[in-house]
Amino acid sequence: MEDNNLVSFDQGWFVIQTYAGYERKVKEDLLERAELYNMADKILRVEIPTETIRTEVNGKMKEVEENLFPGYVLVEMNMTDEAWFIVRNTPNVTGFVGSHGNRSKPTPLFEQEIQDILVGMGKVVREIDFDVFVGKRVRIVDGAFSGFEAPITEINGDKLTLTVDMFGRATPVELDMHQIEDIQA
C-alpha cells in the first residue's frame, strides 16, 4: 500500500545536521560542490528555515532573521549514492536526520511538513481559493498583525496592502498573499 503523503524515496526533501552557526556556510558549500561535481540535477535546492523577528535595538525597531532550526539545513535532492556522498562529506555537515548509520539512506520529510515550512518562510505561496479584490475584508494569518481583519486597499502582483485599524488610526500594512485568509460569512 502506497502512502501518497510521502515524497518519493529517491527524490524528496531531507534534513541534514550541521554544526550550529554554520548553516549558511554549509548551504554555500553544498551548492558549490553540486556545481563542481556536476550534481546540480541531483542536489536541487538548499534552504535554511528562517523567520524575521522584530526587536528593539538601542530604542529603534530592527528586523533580524533567525534560524527556525539551528544546526539543520533542508536539502531537496535525488537520493543517489553519489549525491548522498557529496552532501554527507560537505564540511560542517554531521549527518542526515533519519539515517541509521552504516551508509543507510535517510527518510525524506512528508510533503505536508516541507510545504508548511516553506509557506512559513514565504518560499511557497499557499493556494488562495477565494477571490481577492480591492475592498474585500480578509483576516491576517501570519506576521505581526496575525488575527487582525482588514480591507484590501491595493493589489500589486503578489503583494497586498491592507488598512488595519490600530488605536483609532488607519495603518497601511503590506503583506504577501499567503499571509491572509478569507473571512467566512
UniProtKB/Swiss-Prot annotation:
Record-linked Pfam families: KOW, NusG
Instruction: List the GO cellular component terms.
Output: cytosol
Q: Does the keyword Phosphoprotein apply?
A: no
Q: Which domain of life is it from?
A: Bacteria
Domain named KOW: residues: 134-164
Q: Which CDD domains match?
A: KOW_NusG, NGN_Bact_1
Annotated disulfide bonds: none
What the entry lists under SMART domains is as follows: KOW, NGN
The processes (GO biological process) annotated in the record are:
DNA-templated transcription termination; regulation of DNA-templated transcription elongation; transcription antitermination; transcription elongation-coupled chromatin remodeling
Keyword annotations from UniProtKB, A to Z: Transcription, Transcription antitermination, Transcription regulation, Transcription termination
Q: Which family does it belong to?
A: Belongs to the NusG family.
Q: Which NCBIfam families match?
A: nusG
Query: Could you tell me what this protein does?
Result: Participates in transcription elongation, termination and antitermination.
Name of the protein in question: Transcription termination/antitermination protein NusG
Q: Which organism is it from?
A: Lactococcus lactis subsp. lactis (strain IL1403)
Q: What is the lineage of its organism?
A: Bacteria, Bacillati, Bacillota, Bacilli, Lactobacillales
Tell me the gene name: nusG
